[in-house]
Amino acid sequence: MSSFITKTVLAALVAAAGVRAHGHVESITVGGTEYEGLNPGAAAFENPRKELAAWFATNTDNGFVEPSAFGDADIICHRGAENAVKSAKVKAGEKITIKWDTWPESHKGPVIDYLASCGSAGCAKVDKTSLKFFKIAEAGMTSGGKFASDDLIAAGNTWEVTVPTSIKAGNYVLRHEIIALHAAGQENGAQNYPQCFNLEVESDGTAEPAGVAGTSLYTASEKGIVFDLYNNPTSYPIPGPKMNIAGGSSGAAPSTPATPTTGSGSDTPSNTAAPVESAPAESAAPVESAPAAGNGNQNNGGASPVETEAPATPQPTKTGCKAKKARRHARDMMN
């Protein structure tokens, strides 16, 4: 009985904390250039809207997409998502630093990154339901029961993902996502926070990985979506399709990155490359012992970044939880 009370109280507390603390990606930095992210609360009142490389979304509460909506378009790039009109320029093999404005410690879970080719339509006009996403990096449990989200918080709410070196040049949508597991002990308890950016990739590579429609990335009942965070887990099965491209990696960003310049993004040109759809598959990740920062339990086809130090520099000048209320009833987290 005491175990039941403990689990239900914990679930209620973290749900209440989540109402206040949900976050969004405030910027990405590529090759020393910083691109502004979408602030959904502010963007709802902008007229005209800012022209960004970040996709527009209507999650003004910084809220989430729940598993019951995995078959809906909202899971692709968040609720009510609309195409970004600009693109961030990146070279294959280059790191993208992703900066969240905040992330609650209670919302533990994996960090997963995908790409999808925009094809001949170009990313500013592509139908989001036609995008086929392939996983380029994933991180689940790290050491000592910690999750990738803990590493992200420890790195100042930042994350790094490397664009695969073998990928074909073209225009892509980057889908960066944290899945919060604090209420995932039962079906429909996980919380998905997808964030999308347009990329213009320069590359000599030729790889065109098969992909999966955003509405087919996950199922509500699969392992890793249903997961008991409070039962002292020692491993975590990362959900979603398996990776089928090498040369990508991800991990917590260095504690003192170089000072970026500010970019508005380029107009998104057309691209003729389009991946072929494949069925999703579960990806599990074993526990590793004492990894370096951001290097835990990853299946990413490449080495993860190593923490480095750099001289202190001035901060860059940038250009630029009621909603979907968190469940206030306590979930029965018992198996």
From Swiss-Prot:
<keyword id="KW-0119">Carbohydrate metabolism</keyword>
<dbReference type="GO" id="GO:0030245">
    <property type="term" value="P:cellulose catabolic process"/>
</dbReference>
<comment type="similarity">
    <text>Belongs to the polysaccharide monooxygenase AA9 family.</text>
</comment>
<keyword id="KW-0624">Polysaccharide degradation</keyword>
<dbReference type="Pfam" id="PF03443">
    <property type="entry name" value="AA9"/>
</dbReference>
<keyword id="KW-0136">Cellulose degradation</keyword>
<keyword id="KW-0560">Oxidoreductase</keyword>
<feature type="binding site">
    <location>
        <position position="107"/>
    </location>
    <ligand>
        <name>Cu(2+)</name>
    </ligand>
</feature>
<feature type="binding site">
    <location>
        <position position="193"/>
    </location>
    <ligand>
        <name>Cu(2+)</name>
    </ligand>
</feature>
<keyword id="KW-0479">Metal-binding</keyword>
<comment type="function">
    <text>Lytic polysaccharide monooxygenase (LPMO) that depolymerizes crystalline and amorphous polysaccharides via the oxidation of scissile alpha- or beta-(1-4)-glycosidic bonds, yielding C1 or C4 oxidation products. Catalysis by LPMOs requires the reduction of the active-site copper from Cu(II) to Cu(I) by a reducing agent and H(2)O(2) or O(2) as a cosubstrate. Is capable of cleaving cellulose, but not chitin. Is also active on tamarind xyloglucan and longer xyloglucan oligosaccharides.</text>
</comment>
<feature type="signal peptide">
    <location>
        <begin position="1"/>
        <end position="21"/>
    </location>
</feature>
<keyword id="KW-0186">Copper</keyword>
<feature type="binding site">
    <location>
        <position position="191"/>
    </location>
    <ligand>
        <name>O2</name>
    </ligand>
</feature>
<dbReference type="InterPro" id="IPR005103">
    <property type="entry name" value="AA9_LPMO"/>
</dbReference>
<feature type="region of interest" description="Disordered">
    <location>
        <begin position="241"/>
        <end position="335"/>
    </location>
</feature>
<keyword id="KW-0732">Signal</keyword>
<keyword id="KW-1015">Disulfide bond</keyword>
<dbReference type="GO" id="GO:0004497">
    <property type="term" value="F:monooxygenase activity"/>
</dbReference>
<feature type="binding site">
    <location>
        <position position="22"/>
    </location>
    <ligand>
        <name>Cu(2+)</name>
    </ligand>
</feature>
<dbReference type="GO" id="GO:0005576">
    <property type="term" value="C:extracellular region"/>
</dbReference>
<feature type="compositionally biased region" description="Low complexity">
    <location>
        <begin position="251"/>
        <end position="303"/>
    </location>
</feature>
<keyword id="KW-0503">Monooxygenase</keyword>
<dbReference type="InterPro" id="IPR049892">
    <property type="entry name" value="AA9"/>
</dbReference>
<keyword id="KW-0964">Secreted</keyword>
<dbReference type="GO" id="GO:0046872">
    <property type="term" value="F:metal ion binding"/>
</dbReference>
<feature type="disulfide bond">
    <location>
        <begin position="77"/>
        <end position="196"/>
    </location>
</feature>
<protein>
    <recommendedName>
        <fullName>AA9 family lytic polysaccharide monooxygenase A</fullName>
        <ecNumber>1.14.99.56</ecNumber>
    </recommendedName>
</protein>
<feature type="compositionally biased region" description="Basic residues">
    <location>
        <begin position="321"/>
        <end position="335"/>
    </location>
</feature>
<feature type="binding site">
    <location>
        <position position="182"/>
    </location>
    <ligand>
        <name>O2</name>
    </ligand>
</feature>
